[in-house]
Amino acid sequence: MTTEYLDFELPIAELEAKIEALRSAVGNDNKINLDDEIARLQKKSEELTKKTFSDLDAWQISRMARHPSRPYTLDYIERIFTEFDELAGDRAFADDKAIVGGIARLDGRPVMVIGHQKGRTVKEKVKRNFGMPAPEGYRKALRLMQMAERFNMPIITFIDTPGAYPGIGAEERGQSEAIARNLREMSTLKVPVICTVIGEGGSGGALAIGVGDKVNMLQYSTYSVISPEGCASILWKSAEKASTAAEVMGLTAPRLKELELIDNIVPEPLGGAHRNFDEMAANLKQRLLEDLADLDPLNAEALLDRRYQRLMGYGYV
């Protein structure tokens, strides 16, 4: 996959373009030896990338969370799990493609995996509704969670949505009810629930599959009640203030960890998750295995008590 660069990465992009040009020159003429120059530029590019990503602000992280090349739920399922068997439909209205889920194995152990799914091509984005689920998507997710509970399987969710779909049809079919029901039912599931924000964690649309015993965030993901643009439009009447809004919203992983709203921050490869899908998946898999090891000794009663105490601890100052 061709690397796409954001505007604050342009100096890095220029160096990478020079490296590719030198490699092409070597490929076209075997007599040319540019290994030393290529190595020098690679080292310079790596140092510049480290410097750039060591001090990203909240708005830059927000844009990283939305990066079009960022790995999505199905990318992680392919790399972390085996024997994935997708399950479809809410058994009431339709199969919402913005939510994917099914039974899989994590290191041989049966688990239920559920997550938001965006699209890359225009056709796929339309099919997945840009990762914005309708009520039937959340009802499908709940159906799979309840199935997991019946068969005593841990539940693993991947969160990556700008928010629940706000269309008229979704509201007519009970969008708010579907989200509220998921919040209630997830809080009482008698199996371990591990939630990870892998990109955008947008409002109730994210929270509807985000109530768990462990909540993780990828290093450059975000979690908030509204987008920076939406917040800026309300407070300053202009989306151009999005960068200011992002700073005051506290939507980054370090800030949410500081507030004890999440448990762990999963490190991303240098330059972001989209730079190395396999490395990112390996980091996330390790985190999931460690979380399961922490939760396995707890029986259903202990899980529910722990989850209740967690939820009651939210919102303090």
Swiss-Prot record:
Q: Which reaction does it catalyse?
A: N(6)-carboxybiotinyl-L-lysyl-[protein] + acetyl-CoA = N(6)-biotinyl-L-lysyl-[protein] + malonyl-CoA
Q: Which Gene3D superfamilies match?
A: 2-enoyl-CoA Hydratase, Chain A, domain 1
Record localization? Cytoplasm
Q: Which domain of life is it from?
A: Bacteria
Q: Which GO terms describe its cellular component?
A: acetyl-CoA carboxylase complex
Query: Which keywords annotate this record?
Result: ATP-binding, Cytoplasm, Fatty acid biosynthesis, Fatty acid metabolism, Lipid biosynthesis, Lipid metabolism, Nucleotide-binding, Transferase
Top EC class of this enzyme? transferase
GO molecular function list = acetyl-CoA carboxylase activity; ATP binding; carboxyl- or carbamoyltransferase activity
BP GO annotations: fatty acid biosynthetic process; malonyl-CoA biosynthetic process
> What are the residue boundaries of the CoA carboxyltransferase C-terminal domain, all occurrences included?
33-294
Signal peptide span per the entry?
Answer: none
Q: In which pathway does it act?
A: Lipid metabolism; malonyl-CoA biosynthesis; malonyl-CoA from acetyl-CoA: step 1/1
Family statement drawn from the similarity comment of this UniProt entry: Belongs to the AccA family.
Please describe the quaternary structure of this protein: Acetyl-CoA carboxylase is a heterohexamer composed of biotin carboxyl carrier protein (AccB), biotin carboxylase (AccC) and two subunits each of ACCase subunit alpha (AccA) and ACCase subunit beta (AccD).
Role, per record:
Component of the acetyl coenzyme A carboxylase (ACC) complex. First, biotin carboxylase catalyzes the carboxylation of biotin on its carrier protein (BCCP) and then the CO(2) group is transferred by the carboxyltransferase to acetyl-CoA to form malonyl-CoA.
Protein's recorded name: Acetyl-coenzyme A carboxylase carboxyl transferase subunit alpha
Natural source organism: Glaesserella parasuis serovar 5 (strain SH0165)
